[in-house]
Amino acid sequence: MATNAKPVYKRILLKLSGEALQGTEGFGIDASILDRMAQEIKELVELGIQVGVVIGGGNLFRGAGLAKAGMNRVVGDHMGMLATVMNGLAMRDALHRAYVNARLMSAIPLNGVCDNYSWAEAISLLRNNRVVILSAGTGNPFFTTDSAACLRGIEIEADVVLKATKVDGVFTADPAKDPSATMYEQLSYNEVLDQELKVMDLAAFTLARDHKLPIRVFNMNKPGALRRVVMGEKEGTLITE
């Protein structure tokens, strides 16, 4: 397949799920997966791409189960935010070990652990080819890390949100349950809403749509997929106007 000589994106927001870091363990952080992701991000930096990263926290804490057991939702969400900071610390460390300059910012103040999130500072760091990891979600309860990814993507003026998942893209049905499910190469925002396709939660998705922020869903477990996406190759599902 013919590839572009240059990346098709200048600045991206990479959304990683916490589950992507846990590997086969089902919990926690798999060091080998973390290091592989750091190497893939390093490749993008070497291509001259400015990279912002938002990581979920589901590998360390899931508030939904405890909420059902009676825990206050705000408390659960605050715990989830701290889980994303823990993942961010691990990712920053992996990037530093890969000789990539990275800065960790948090939407909630954690002095001595990481920097407070600042929109202007984040953009300045990106322009200086630093990877910026944006943790603690939006800093508010009731908002998912997908919402944080879209919000931060809009704020840092990213060209696209790249949503890394465990499947190759957006399918007509759940490929794990329906072997006849086929993958979409491209969709409009309205097609996703009309067909009720599960891309991300509605608040996050409508935020991206309202600000015309493209979303590309791809499989981060597939080696080289991230690079193929930024080089404009056929990879994953693109959602745009």
Swiss-Prot record:
Q: One Pfam family this chain carries? A: AA_kinase
Residues that, per the record, bind ATP: 15-18, 58, 62, 165, 171, 174
Query: What is the E.C. number?
Result: 2.7.4.22
Q: How is its activity regulated?
A: Allosterically activated by GTP. Inhibited by UTP.
Swiss-Prot/TrEMBL catalytic activity: UMP + ATP = UDP + ADP
Report any one BP term from Gene Ontology. UDP biosynthetic process
Any idea which GO molecular function terms this record carries?
A: ATP binding; UMP kinase activity
Which keywords accompany this UniProt record? Allosteric enzyme, ATP-binding, Cytoplasm, Kinase, Nucleotide-binding, Pyrimidine biosynthesis, Transferase
Q: Which residues bind UMP?
A: 57, 77, 138-145
Instruction: Explain the purpose of this protein.
Output: Catalyzes the reversible phosphorylation of UMP to UDP.
Against PANTHER family, the record matches this protein to:
URIDYLATE KINASE, URIDYLATE KINASE PUMPKIN, CHLOROPLASTIC
- Listed name of the protein: Uridylate kinase
- Its source organism is Enterobacter sp. (strain 638)
Gene responsible for this protein: pyrH
